[in-house]
Amino acid sequence: IRDGEAVLAGVQFKQAKTSQPCKPTQPGDHGVKLVTGFDLNKGLPKLIEAITAQCAHVAERQSRERTAVLLLSRRNEPLRTIQAQLDRKLPVKAYTIHRAKGLQAEVAIIVDDCAPVQPHPLRNALYAYSGFFRNSYDQAMADESLRLGYVAITRGVSRVFWYTRKAQGATERLSRRG
């Protein structure tokens, strides 16, 4: 929860909120473990091993969560690639981060960057000209990227692993927490 709040701290336009965990922390629980330098094509075998290990961890712990491991990405393509290599008997559900809103699992594994989109001068000008928005288009997209990171992080009940090529956006904020 605290890692999710750390990501939300970077959102410029938001309603402040704090969360309370509803379960006590158990040995082995942790917030987000960031794995940088990850390339899906080269790192797929190790990722499959990690997912399998997390399924075994959840089985040992006799969790009451209906889903052992939730595999998340912003896009469907990486999810399909990973699922094609996973043992179908493993208790893993794969969703885009948007579709996973409201779901949870004992362990969440995120494969994504959640980086904001590139600057867009025309949309910034339209936002400013319309008078409807307090912020620029670029700021709105950066905020949305961080909110999406928050949603992904808070899907994991006891553990979260985030695999990304480079720390940027939400993962960059997490890499600074020390």
Language-model regions: role of each:
Residues 36-117:
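Conserved helicase/translocase motor-coupling segment
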Residues 1, 79-81, 103-104, 117-122, ...:
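Switch/connector loops and helix/strand junctions flanking conserved nucleotide-binding motifs
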Residues 1-29:
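Conserved coupling/interface region of RecA-like P-loop/ASCE motor cores
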Residues 9-14, 54, 58, 178:
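Helicase-associated low-complexity regulatory tails and linkers flanking the ATPase motor
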Residues 1-4, 47, 51, 145, ...:
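Structural preference for long, well-ordered alpha-helical segments in enzyme cores
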Residues 118-178:
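C-terminal accessory regions
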Residues 29-30, 90, 104-107, 156-159:
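Short glycine-/polar-rich loops that comprise or flank the Walker A/P-loop
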